[in-house]
Amino acid sequence: MTSYFKMLAGSVSAVLIGVSSSNAQGRLSEGDIIKSLAGSAQAARAADLNTDALRRDVEKRIQVEGTENAASPPPALQALAKMPNLTVQIQFDFDSDWIRPASWETIGVIADALHHPLLLSNKFIVVGHTDAKGKRAYNLKLSQRRADAVRDMLVSTFRIEPGRLVAVGLGEEQLQDQNNPNAGVNRRVQFLNIGPR
């Protein structure tokens, strides 16, 4: 690892768990992350997205029966799907927002990409998603805690400016595999480029 942040993630991992910092999830490259998150005119138009309103819309939605796994999500969620994004599997302890050491290197590589000049002037939403196990209201809160945990690690450990990251939990409201709502692929974290800050 040549980058400062990859070395920091590896050092933290090795010190705390006493093993190599290799990542069982497979390796993300900084270049692939930059390519996925590179800004576009669409991202710039999305910069005025109101994340507080998005949270309120999702909270209202989970109160309504029959909206689980709905084929047509609300417009705000449809807009998120069109933004430059990166989806990663971040491992958490069960029913917890504690990030497992196996994912620290992944977060370090993401931090390297966010420090790259092509992305440095942009703002991002860190979106937490869950599967459909459990109650929707609980999953919404858990996904928010997990998105907050990833954001906090990027800020405190990898020195990403706090104003560049907004954490939003969507619970099970945007399943990646709607045919298998309890599948592990639905438990994920997304990074969305919402344009210049």
Region roles according to the model:
Residues 2-81:
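N-terminal targeting leaders that direct proteins to extracytoplasmic destinations
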Residues 7, 17, 117-119, 158-160, ...:
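Generic structural signal for beta-strand residues in well-ordered domains
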Residues 13, 96, 115, 136, ...:
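Generic anion/oxyanion-binding catalytic loop in active/binding sites
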Residues 32, 49, 53, 57, ...:
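Extracytoplasmic/secreted proteins, especially bacterial periplasmic and envelope-associated proteins
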Residues 71, 76, 81, 85, ...:
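Periplasmic peptidoglycan-binding/anchoring modules of Gram-negative envelope and division proteins
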Residues 90-98, 133-138:
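Short coil/turn segments at secondary-structure junctions
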Residues 129-197:
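Periplasmic OmpA-like peptidoglycan-binding domain that tethers envelope proteins to the cell wall
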